[in-house]
């Protein structure tokens, strides 16, 4: 690995640790030339399935779109970034675990709602109201009633 400080090619690993529930390796490295230390993260590159939209079009899975949807739902709610990242990791693991090359966007929305209902009920209602396109107050009431069961 090249040193980010002096671009030398000779670096050595000083320390390695598992992070992110064992899904990544954190390595502390030192440059043999300038002796600067830096941290790298290594993870498996796993291919996500393509997303089939409701109109039948297909597009690559977009993790940032997933993250953005969750961040909008939990905005100004007492949910930590760690909780959000864990929920996103669970969603991605479930999608990869299907073994399918393509998945429907509906499945992603349902997985998102499963995670949000466990994180924050208000965030769940926010997301569900947009995802399910609530038309009036009674639909909000129905969703809240389901949460209270």
From Swiss-Prot:
The protein's name in its UniProt record: Transcriptional repressor NrdR
Required co-factors: Zn(2+)
Domain ATP-cone, chain residue ranges per copy: 49-139
Zinc finger (unnamed): 3-34
Similarity remark: Belongs to the NrdR family.
Gene encoding the protein: nrdR
Annotated organism of origin: Shewanella woodyi (strain ATCC 51908 / MS32)
High-level lineage: Bacteria, Pseudomonadati, Pseudomonadota, Gammaproteobacteria, Alteromonadales
UniProt-recorded Gene Ontology molecular function terms: ATP binding; DNA binding; zinc ion binding
UniProt keyword annotation of Transcription regulation present: yes
């Amino acid at each position: 690995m090249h040193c980010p400080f002096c671009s030398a090619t000779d670096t050595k690993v000083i320390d390695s640790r598992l992070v992110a529930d064992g899904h990544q390796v954190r390595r502390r490295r030192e440059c043999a030339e300038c002796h600067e230390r830096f941290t790298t993260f290594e993870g498996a590159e796993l291919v996500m399935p393509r997303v089939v939209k409701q109109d039948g079009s297909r597009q690559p899975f977009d993790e940032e779109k997933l993250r953005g949807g969750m961040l909008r739902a939990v905005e100004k709610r007492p949910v930590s970034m760690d909780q959000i990242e864990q929920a996103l990791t669970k969603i991605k693991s479930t999608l990869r675990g299907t073994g399918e090359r393509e998945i429907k966007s509906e499945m992603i929305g349902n997985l998102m709602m499963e995670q949000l209902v466990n994180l924050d009920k208000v965030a769940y209602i926010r997301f569900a109201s947009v995802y399910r396109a609530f038309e009036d107050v009674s639909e909000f009431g129905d969703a809240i009633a389901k949460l209270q069961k």
